Amino acid sequence: MTKRTLRGSVRKKKRTSGFRARMETPTGRRVIKARRSRGRVRLTTV
């Protein structure tokens, strides 16, 4: 049996694509704005 090579890290995910990370940059804020306008239930992952 081979071991899993891809293990997701919650901390890394939050730091790169979390809500607060998105709000730091102008393009990230644009992403949130676009997702809000589309009526997304989840604005960000994690």
From Swiss-Prot:
Which InterPro entries does the UniProt record give? Ribosomal_bL34
Annotated keywords: Ribonucleoprotein, Ribosomal protein
Stretches of Basic residues bias are at 1-17
GO CC, alphabetical: ribonucleoprotein complex; ribosome
Q: Which GO terms describe its molecular function?
A: structural constituent of ribosome
Q: Is Ribosomal protein among the key words of this record?
A: yes
Q: Which residue intervals make up region (Disordered)?
A: 1-26
Q: Which processes are annotated in GO (biological process)?
A: translation
Kindly indicate whether the keyword Ribonucleoprotein belongs to this entry: yes
Question: Which NCBIfam families does the UniProt record give?
Answer: rpmH_bact (TIGR01030)
Family according to the record: Belongs to the bacterial ribosomal protein bL34 family.
The protein's name in its UniProt record: Large ribosomal subunit protein bL34
Q: Which organism is it from?
A: Pseudanabaena sp. (strain PCC 6903)
